[in-house]
Amino acid sequence: MRQKDIYFMPLGGAQSVGRSCYYLRLGQSNILLDCGLQRINGATCSPDFHSLLTSQFMESMQQLDHVYISHAHTDHVGYLPQLMQMAPQASVYMTLQTKQLAEYRLIANSSQTGAAEASRLLSNVAPVNYLQKIKQRDYTVTFFPAGHIPGAMMTLFEYAGRKILYTGDYSLQSAFGLDGCWLPDDLEVDVLLMCALHAKQPYSVREKNTLPQRISEVMSNLRYGQSVYLQAFDPGRVLELLMALNREMEQSGQVYPIYLEPEAMAAVHVMESLQLPVLQQNNYSSFYAGAAHPHVVIGTKRKEQVSWRYRIFGNAYTLHEDYGEMLSFIRRLNPRQAYLVHCAEGYYGHTVEQELMRDAQCRTQVVFPEEGDIYTI
């Protein structure tokens, strides 16, 4: 290995969605970007640490120096407690909001013993602020807001005269009091490590199937006197829907009752116990038959279990950028190289790579890295 070379190795979530975890070597520093898990048919899939430990970089997890967590979705943070047990010496960085949300998610998905251990481990996390700069042994790192969900951050590394930006999941658009991502206008990036969900899906359009679109449809139904039932089978979805609805109602001045079924309220109570306020005056812990219409119910009932009085909205929506927004983001930064990870399966055989190759103003070489492969940047 040459001293000034930069090495990149996906350990999960390369050309798939789930268990995002990426190894980055800067000088003598061993770094992990995110540490997620994926559940498939009841089985838990973790990052491929075996490939890392049989590589030229590390022989033991005790050699890991730093971990940077972009945001609190399970596919980016879910395996962190296990990693912290394997590598207790590694410094872990995330924003305070991400730490709070991560603690909730990890507690909600663990046994009582596992929840206590997750809480203990997360107490050792070093919270960071946006625009904060930290000088490490071999490099400097700065954090920027990523949008997407509260607390999400982009991470900029400066090493050997080069700048490497890891986006994590991000959003260019502002919605419900949460601003989109922000980077300095004059920022020059050499290498972009980009979570690019729709990089292989040219007909992905943000206006379809997004959280803002979902909230807009809910509010439209309420204005016409139609009560709404929101299915939220994941605790994180409960919080996203409730917080987004509360923000929209506050901003519009049109406030309707929101009832939370027991499973949904349990998720909220955990967040409140972590000093992250969620509930508003129009939020109620249970629904009663005589409740005036229109109103919203957030719960876990299947379609056939819900009264015909309700317009039902399912659990599927996206918080990600669309294909066109991704292209504009890459063109704006115009990096020398862009490594696109966290990519959903394509279905038209067309990717952002072909689009950018036809752009004479764009210098970016696009790479779709594979898990377990080592890339010299």
Pin down the residues of each PLM region.
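Hard-cation-handling environments
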Residues: P212-S307, V341
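Pre-active-site segment of Zn-dependent metallo-hydrolases
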Residues: A14-R19, L26-I69, H73-T74, G78-A90, ...
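A short helix->loop->beta-strand "cap" motif at the edges of active sites that frequently abuts
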Residues: S29, A87-S91, Y224-Q226, G253-Y256, ...
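Core dinuclear metal-dependent hydrolase active-site scaffold
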Residues: M1-Q62, N129-D179, H295-V296, K301-K303, ...
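Active-site neighborhood of phospho(di)ester-bond hydrolases with catalytic His/Asp-centered motifs
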Residues: L32-C35, L64-D75, L80, Y93-T95, ...
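C-terminal regulatory/interaction regions
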Residues: L11, S16, R247, S285-I377
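Metallo-beta-lactamase
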Residues: E103-A152, L274-P294
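Functional cores that coordinate and move charged inorganic groups
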Residues: M153-A244
